[in-house]
Amino acid sequence: MPRKKGAAWEEPSSGNGTARAGPRRRGGPAGRKRERPERCSSSSGGGSSGDEDGPELDGAPGGGKRTARPATAGKAAGAAAIITEPEHTKERVKLEGSKCKGQLLIFGATNWDLIGRKEVPKQQAAYRNLGQNLWGPHRYGCLSGVRVRTVVSGSCAAHSLLITTEGKLWSWGRNEKGQLGHGDTKRVEAPRLIEALSHEAIVLAACGRNHTLALTDTGSVFAFGENKMGQLGLGNQTDAVPSPAQIMYNGQPITKMACGAEFSMLMDCKGNLYSFGCPEYGQLGHNSDGKFIARAQRIEYDCELVPRRVAIFIEKTKDGQILPVPNVVVRDVACGANHTLVLDSQKRVFSWGFGGYGRLGHAEQKDEMVPRLVKLFDFPGRGATQIYAGYTCSFAVSEVGGLFFWGATNTSRESTMYPKAVQDLCGWRIRSLACGKSSIIVAADESTISWGPSPTFGELGYGDHKPKSSTAAQEVKTLDGIFSEQVAMGYSHSLVIARDESEAEKEKLQRLPEYTPRTL
């Protein structure tokens, strides 16, 4: 087996990422816990301090930071321009889901209300002792006979989704904001069909911290969960939307999507990119962080409540000149907690949003308000074919198969300020990669590989009575002989689709322990 040696790591935060405090208008006051203190010493490039606005561009939508505006109670649904395409020019699409087929395996933390927190909130106290840390792969007893083609979670998420081979969407996990789509806010211990979407053929889904998007085979998007920052794209701001609702968008069919902590990105069939939700670090790509001074000197954020097109892509020359990059056709999009990555038709990578720890790959820690070209992938033969975003880091797979990493997974260690090859995985053909808060899991060739710093909660899958963490990439021995079609990772749990086509594969899966969670 080729060398597999480590990467950098991050200590877990006591709260669930960048927890937001209290109800607010539009985007709310800046009195909440922020990512801003993340600015750190780094291996190259300089850190930025204070609030950087990113490039000032002539004719840029939004025009940077706003200094004052009336403290109104948020945009009315009709005030924002809804993307609309005439019916006669709309593409007719029939999207297909993943070709993967297999059984779902889970490992990691399953006490959903405790994930990323010091203790279970009082309102969830009844669930305090439900769930456990699964140190090795388990099968869900309730999914016997259910074949899965896609699993979904997110680096900020304590909930998960699966799409069956029939195109049905199931969900389970934390549900305080209705992000499971079952019409209530009750926690769900094991995968359960979302009845409200049972008549739809779902091909793709995405998880934010407390919200969810689901894409149908006709290119329509349904959203549910928290909507305080407008991240559901429904034209309003509400605490919770527990049942699936179609977003306010009537443009070309959507083909891809991704969720950050409190924002969402969509890509249409023509390669246009749209964003909505929290604009705080510029992650929406509209040349603004949406900040304005409300009454009593409160800082609030002008959230995007419906999808808005990302219109400007730029590159910066060595002498600091800003040049527009024309004719960008988006092919893929990925979101971290507060940053966004895009892959275009020319295999170029753009990144923007929060710049802490070098997660944008521009050799500086400055926030970027519009998509900025990552230079490394803009050379012949050096283009990217896959992109992945972690909580505070980014990955890309080059067209020759090399894995590149930038940012940090352990924020107490040195950051990687620009894309560097991950030597540990040199020579491996990477099929699927996923990031949690600070752990990584990879499906490559016939193996599943994971690594992550202490503390971990079983998401690395090394098994009972084994080391629980590793700063070096290691094969997951508990999955020896099991082919991982796809991997996904939540804040501190992992999901795997294990191929079950041959009798030998089925037999190996049957030997894995079955997990039947306790319920109230």
From Swiss-Prot:
It is found in: Nucleus, Nucleolus; Nucleus; Cytoplasm, Cytoskeleton; Chromosome, Centromere. Residues 1-78 are annotated as: Disordered. The modification Phosphothreonine is found at T18, T340. It is a peripheral membrane protein. Residues 22-34 have a biased composition (Basic residues). Keywords: Acetylation, Cell cycle, Cell division, Cell membrane, Centromere, Chromosome, Cytoplasm, Cytoskeleton, Guanine-nucleotide releasing factor, Membrane, Microtubule, Mitosis, Nucleus, Phosphoprotein, Repeat. RCC1 repeats lie at residues 101-163, 166-217, 219-269, 271-345, 346-399, 401-445, 446-499. GO terms for molecular function: guanyl-nucleotide exchange factor activity; microtubule binding; protein domain specific binding; protein kinase binding; small GTPase binding. The gene is Rcc2. The keyword Flavoprotein does not apply. The modification Phosphoserine is found at S14, S41, S42, S43, S44, S48, S49. Its main location: nucleus. The keyword Transport does not apply. Interacts with RAC1. Interacts with nucleotide-free and with GDP and GTP-bound forms of RAC1, with a slight preference for GDP-bound RAC1. Binds preferentially to the nucleotide-free form of RAC1. Interacts with CORO1C. Interacts with microtubules. Gene3D superfamilies: Regulator of chromosome condensation 1/beta-lactamase-inhibitor protein II (2.130.10.30). GO terms for cellular component: chromosome, centromeric core domain; early endosome membrane; microtubule; midbody; mitotic spindle midzone; nucleolus; nucleus; plasma membrane. Multifunctional protein that may affect its functions by regulating the activity of small GTPases, such as RAC1 and RALA. Required for normal progress through the cell cycle, both during interphase and during mitosis. Required for the presence of normal levels of MAD2L1, AURKB and BIRC5 on inner centromeres during mitosis, and for normal attachment of kinetochores to mitotic spindles. Required for normal organization of the microtubule cytoskeleton in interphase cells. Functions as a guanine nucleotide exchange factor (GEF) for RALA. PROSITE patterns: RCC1_2 (PS00626), RCC1_3 (PS50012). It holds the Pfam family WD40_RLD. This is Protein RCC2. Residues 69-78 have a biased composition (Low complexity). The modification N6-acetyllysine is found at K90, K122, K291, K375. Induction: Induced by TP53/p53 in response to oxidative stress and DNA damage. Residues 316-323 are annotated as: Required for interaction with RAC1. GO terms for biological process: activation of GTPase activity; cell division; chromosome passenger complex localization to kinetochore; establishment of protein localization; focal adhesion assembly; integrin-mediated signaling pathway; negative regulation of focal adhesion assembly; negative regulation of GTPase activity.
